[in-house]
Amino acid sequence: MSEKFKVEVVTPTRVVLDKEVEEVIAPGIMGEFGVLIGHTPMLTFVKPGVLSYLENDKFIKFAVGEGFCEVLADRVSVLVDEAYAVEELDAVAVSSELQGLEQQLVAIDATADPEGYRKLTSKLKMARAKLSLASGS
């Protein structure tokens, strides 16, 4: 059995996850990164995507939004604007949300509103991550 460390996933409104796990894989801005116990301390950005953790030889997945991840030798803290476990997601509702966001993307002028465009593309990435989990992909 592998050594375990604590992982916390926290949003502004709730603690989504607080467990002892064997490994964490998170979506960083430079790509996915993995963490095992004893990892070198770091602070990094998290982009919208799928965060997974290994517990009892099984990976459990969450959809996470933008935020930060602090890695210490014996703890990982993930602070994001939103996070959802698979059982919280409805594929039909998420698919509808994704379609609406894609329509908004077509209508937005990225040059005139770069911040609005960035926020919308971030929401799109989050919706795609949620749909991936909700549909079992």
Where are these regions (language model features)?
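N-terminal helix initiation/capping motif
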Residues: 1-3
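Compact, glycine-rich, soluble single-domain proteins
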Residues: 6-95
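Acidic/glycine-rich phosphate/pyrophosphate-binding loops and surrounding catalytic core
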Residues: 87-137
